[in-house]
């Protein structure tokens, strides 16, 4: 997984969301969702790569 990958992330309150990885650091994977106003910080177990760049 790397920056720019299209991913599906499983969230606690909003279900599964599609988004793009914008940063990976020790806090987790930062994702910019397509149809949600806030960025998501997720653990690796909650993220599935759909399209790798």
Predicted regions and their residues:
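Basic/aromatic-rich interaction segments and small domains that mediate binding to polyanionic partners
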Residues: 2-53
